[in-house]
């Protein structure tokens, strides 16, 4: 639409960033008061890593949008039991999956589980439409699975990291999360055990001190 240029490359990431900030505000407003919602949106929008992801057009921008939007809609569904919120939750979760595999959906599912646990809303699982989330989710990610299939499964001759015979389906459904979590692709890096702690200092700057104080 906009041609091949920097604006066309970064504009979608700006839209995803706006979705993230708006979803954070709406979710916080649903769970708390207006002041808290404004502060939550402000902290996300001005954090160092979030701004960097937009300017560099990184995959973390649509990942964040999918997670936050999907979580917001899932919480709304649990509280209001409206089918439209369930569908939008599946859409957000599918967007998150499309970026980095199961990482996004796992974050959403774990958060929702503890929300249900703390609020004792187990009755949501007795509704038939709740379970419709599963087929809708897989329907929405089917284009992504197909894209990985035609790029890799149909071309086993492709050499990646010195190896051929890669399966795109296996990568997005398994390797993207589980192999990375197990460190199978970073065995030689010997990362510090405190990596996430000191990385959070700059990534959530200037709010990292407040976050650590809250912990």
Residue ranges and their predicted role:
Residues 1-15:
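Juxtamembrane segments of multi-pass membrane glycosylation machinery
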Residues 11-31, 69:
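Transmembrane-helix motifs of polytopic, lipid-linked glycan transferases
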Residues 13, 49-62:
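Short acidic/glycine- and proline-prone juxtamembrane loop motifs at membrane-interface regions
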Residues 15-18, 45, 61-72, 86-89, ...:
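Alpha-helical transmembrane segments of multi-pass membrane proteins
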Residues 24-46:
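Transmembrane-helix signature of polytopic, membrane-embedded enzymes
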Residues 30-31, 35, 70-88:
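Membrane-interface transmembrane helices that cradle and orient dolichyl/undecaprenyl
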Residues 52, 85-100:
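Membrane-interface alpha helices of multi-pass inner-membrane proteins
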Residues 104-215:
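Transmembrane-lumen/periplasm boundary regions of multi-pass, lipid-linked membrane glycan transferases
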């Amino acid at each position: 639409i906009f041609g091949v240029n920097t604006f066309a490359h970064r504009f979608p990431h700006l839209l995803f960033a706006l979705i993230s900030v708006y979803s954070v505000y709406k979710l916080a407003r649903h769970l708390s008061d207006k002041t808290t919602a404004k502060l939550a949106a402000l902290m996300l929008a001005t954090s160092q890593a979030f701004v960097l992801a937009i300017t560099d057009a990184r995959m973390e921008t649509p990942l964040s949008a999918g997670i936050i939007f999907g979580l917001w809609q899932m919480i709304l569904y649990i509280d209001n039991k409206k089918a439209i919120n369930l569908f939008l939750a599946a859409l957000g979760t599918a967007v998150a999956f499309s970026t980095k595999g199961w990482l996004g959906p796992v974050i959403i599912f774990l958060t929702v589980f503890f929300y249900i646990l703390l609020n004792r809303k187990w009755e949501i699982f007795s509704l038939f439409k709740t379970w419709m989330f599963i087929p809708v989710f897989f329907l929405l990610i089917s284009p992504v699975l197909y894209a990985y299939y035609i790029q890799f499964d149909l071309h086993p001759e492709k050499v990646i990291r010195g190896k051929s015979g890669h399966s795109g389906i296996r990568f997005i459904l398994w390797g993207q999360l589980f192999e990375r979590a197990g460190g199978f692709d970073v065995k030689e890096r010997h990362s510090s055990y405190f990596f996430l702690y000191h990385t959070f200092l700059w990534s959530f700057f200037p709010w990292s001190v407040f976050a650590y104080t809250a912990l």
